Regions:
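P-loop NTPase motor domains
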Residues: 1-4, 8-10, 61-73, 79-81, ...
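Glycine-rich phosphate-binding loop of nucleotide-binding enzymes
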Residues: 4-77
Length: 243
């Protein structure tokens, strides 16, 4: 009886997942069954029915069209586009030398993960101490200075080169490809509107070398956005295609 009703009832049954104890969901189906179409339909409904924000991690760049339709932001992550996300971006105008808000500490922890990906191996205790020292110096100097600026990876690289330890030079050498080399897409100021209500991160064109670092930077940016939205009482819908 129940299966017969499901076959004959071709109406779209829409529920508000935000009212559930756990509103997470999965979309399953064989290729060509309409999974992406269903997600796009739900995204449109969410976007038009309130002020919730939508973020999409798009491994095949197939959600660019709907983002552009709704005036959203498309961030095409690759070495040959001019879309940049600065991993060191922070509200430097809210910094204080004592790091009372923990902003520098959180960025230091993120940079440990980023440097580990660039080096390609686990960090030892000396490397961790050097990286943390350089991150703290970079942001504390900005906090104490009269003119505020958002640092980029080359600023961090320069501070590493100033350190007396040989390990600091080794870390800087591992970062060189991603700072001054051909994979330097993260050595730029952010030039895309990641605060848009509808943001799609396209990752189809990433190479194997850049993919792990890009995922780390992208997830850091997304996490910061979700936390900020939570403080404002705004819901965030995160879609991860081809999970």
């Amino acid at each position: 009886m129940g299966s017969e009703m499901c076959i004959r009832d071709r109406n779209v049954n829409i529920g508000n997942r935000k009212k559930l104890i756990n509103g997470n969901g999965f979309v399953f189906g064989v290729p060509g069954s309409g999974k992406s179409f269903f997600c796009k339909m739900e995204m449109g409904s969410v976007f038009l029915s309130g002020d919730d924000e939508i973020i999409v991690i798009d491994p095949m760049n197939e959600y660019f069209d709907i983002a552009q339709t709704y005036g959203g932001t498309v961030v095409n992550m690759s070495t040959y586009t001019d879309n940049y996300v600065n991993p060191l971006e922070m509200d430097v105008w809210s910094l204080d030398p004592n790091d009372s808000k923990g902003m520098i500490r959180e960025k230091g922890e993120f940079m440990l993960g980023l440097c580990e990906q660039c080096i390609g191996d686990s960090l030892n205790s000396r490397q961790k101490s050097i990286i943390d020292r350089c991150v703290r110096k970079m942001y504390i100097d900005i906090a104490r200075g009269r003119e505020k600026y958002i640092p980029v990876m080359s600023d961090f690289y320069d501070i590493l080169m100033e350190q007396p330890e040989d390990e600091a030079k080794d870390i800087a050498l591992s970062l060189e490809l991603f700072v001054n080399g051909s994979l330097n897409i993260f050595n730029h100021q952010t030039n895309v509107d990641v605060d848009n209500r509808f943001t799609v991160y396209g990752i189809r064109d990433l190479g194997t070398e850049l993919s792990p670092i890009t995922m780390l930077v992208m997830m850091e940016s997304i996490q910061n956005r979700i936390v900020e939205n939570g403080k404002r009482g705004k819901a965030t819908w995160l879609y991860i295609d081809e999970f």
